[in-house]
Amino acid sequence: MAVAAYVLIRCRGGKEDRVLSTIRQKPHVKKADLVFGDYDIIAYLEFDELPSTFSVAELNHIVTEEIRKVDGVSSTSTHIVTTKFSGEGRG
């Protein structure tokens, strides 16, 4: 089963478009959108072909080293998906 996570991203004022463009280019980011609310961007990360040794520590590394260090990012909140649902139920 693939590991997936949502990363909620706060940006410094005026940096949202640049951050979004940069985040969308990251290899594990499948989707990223600007949103209204407490956060500015919600990114969906998915790891399709994982080695059996993949760990949350590796996800943490990707978030802290590849996303938080993007110029304009002020903070993030990561939420790991535990169960996926499709339009027809679980899946």
What are these regions (language model features)?
Residues 1-91:
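A compositional/biophysical signature of low hydrophobicity enriched in polar/charged and small residues
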